[in-house]
């Protein structure tokens, strides 16, 4: 037997993005984000080395302002089970000339791989909506004016064969989902969906 010494140099796992961008909704908007893909929630001395993903993102424009803080542990309880949580805020005026919409809340999720390319995900989302109707809005929009609490749970199954998530060159993504809003709150709806891209 022989001993083999291997030196490993860890690449940078954190990033900071600040910039200006354009979109069809906003003529121009500012954005900023901090991401650490080797975060460690349980190591308060350095907060790195745990393989978790932590991100803070914000965007400010004339029509939208939003911000979010998210954290994902891909090996929750030392199992092949991803646990994620997110806190978010959004203020939008581009939906209609007759009303503005503000929403904020949090979400928690569990994602379990089935095979190499597919997984199931269970998510719970609690979200506060505020609809502000404008003075010249039709009566329909004034009937929706006010605050609404939405408590939503959703189960989805996804097959993802893409070679990359940001700029895929081949493969596709297929998703089937079912959700229910009504575990408390003011909204009581069902939703079912099938999404796909190739």
Residue ranges and their predicted role:
Residues 104-110, 172-182, 187-198:
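Transmembrane beta-barrel strand/turn architecture of Gram-negative outer membrane proteins
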Residues 1-167, 172-173:
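Gram-negative/organellar outer-membrane beta-barrel architecture
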């Amino acid at each position: 037997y022989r001993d083999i010494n291997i030196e490993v140099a860890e690449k940078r796992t954190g990033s900071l993005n600040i910039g200006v961008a354009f979109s069809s909704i906003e003529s121009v908007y500012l954005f900023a984000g901090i991401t650490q893909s080797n975060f460690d929630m349980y190591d308060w001395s350095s907060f790195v080395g745990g393989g978790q993903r932590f991100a803070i993102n914000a965007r400010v424009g004339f029509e939208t302002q939003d911000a979010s803080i998210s954290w994902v542990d891909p090996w929750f309880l030392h199992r092949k089970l991803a646990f994620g949580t997110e806190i978010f805020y959004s203020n939008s005026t581009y939906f209609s000339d007759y009303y503005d919409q503000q929403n904020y809340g949090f979400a928690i999720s569990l994602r379990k791989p089935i095979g190499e390319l597919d997984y199931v995900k269970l998510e719970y989302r609690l979200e506060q909506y505020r609809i502000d109707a404008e003075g010249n809005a039709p009566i329909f929009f004034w009937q929706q004016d006010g605050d609404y609490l939405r408590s939503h749970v959703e189960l989805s199954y996804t097959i993802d064969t893409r070679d990359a998530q940001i700029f895929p060159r081949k493969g596709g993504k297929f998703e089937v989902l079912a959700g229910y809003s009504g575990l408390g709150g003011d909204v009581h709806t069902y939703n079912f969906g099938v999404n796909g891209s190739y």
